Amino acid sequence: MMKLKSNQTRTYDGDGYKKRAACLCFRSESEEEVLLVSSSRHPDRWIVPGGGMEPEEEPSVAAVREVCEEAGVKGTLGRLVGIFENQERKHRTYVYVLIVTEVLEDWEDSVNIGRKREWFKIEDAIKVLQCHKPVQASYFETLRQGYPANNGTPVVPTTYSSSVSGIR
């Protein structure tokens, strides 16, 4: 299923969830520092770069495209961390590891909407994400648990109380 919204086509899976893809962009293979970007809706908040998949687009291709647009980085795509559900917002996001090999000086979202990017130590990234993006904070817990990147990757359902979900 597809829906048009302004300049983009949104794709949905059979359950009506928006299909999304994102990357945990690490500075090196040691995976000690991760790149977060400022939210387009709340520029004072940090988020994991990612977004909606285009029609017929593979999740891995969408993830690489989204991080280039939102964070201005390119790199080596690694393992699939997992597929995460945000039941409150009806999103299903494929999350990958990306080892950054190139940092662009100017990129699409920096030019168009003034988006910023910043490197965070993992613990600090979890802290800044927990209050307003708890599903994104859970990406790191799943990464630590080391689920294999294969067809058996579990869908990780996440639900949070309405008091938390009202904070975007």
UniProtKB/Swiss-Prot annotation:
Keywords recorded for this protein, A-Z: Acetylation, Cytoplasm, Hydrolase, Magnesium, Metal-binding, Nucleus
Binding locations of Mg(2+) 2: E66
Binding locations of substrate: R10, K18, K19, R20, S39, S40, R41, R89, K90, H91, R115, K133
Tissue expression from the record: Present in heart, lung, liver and spleen (at protein level). Widely expressed.
Disulphide bond pairs: none
Cofactor binding, per record: Binds 3 Mg(2+) ions per subunit.
SUPFAM superfamilies the record matches: Nudix (SSF55811)
Motif interval(s): Nudix box: 51-72
Catalytic residue positions: E69
EC number: 3.6.1.52, 3.6.1.61, 3.6.1.10, 3.6.1.62
Protein's UniProt keywords contain Metal-binding: yes
Compartmental location: Cytoplasm; Nucleus
Domain called Nudix hydrolase: residue spans: 17-144
Protein family per UniProt: Belongs to the Nudix hydrolase family. DIPP subfamily.
Subunit structure: Monomer.
Cited PANTHER family: DIPHOSPHOINOSITOL POLYPHOSPHATE PHOSPHOHYDROLASE, DIPHOSPHOINOSITOL POLYPHOSPHATE PHOSPHOHYDROLASE 1
Protein name (database record): Diphosphoinositol polyphosphate phosphohydrolase 1
Organism expressing this protein natively: Mus musculus (Mouse)
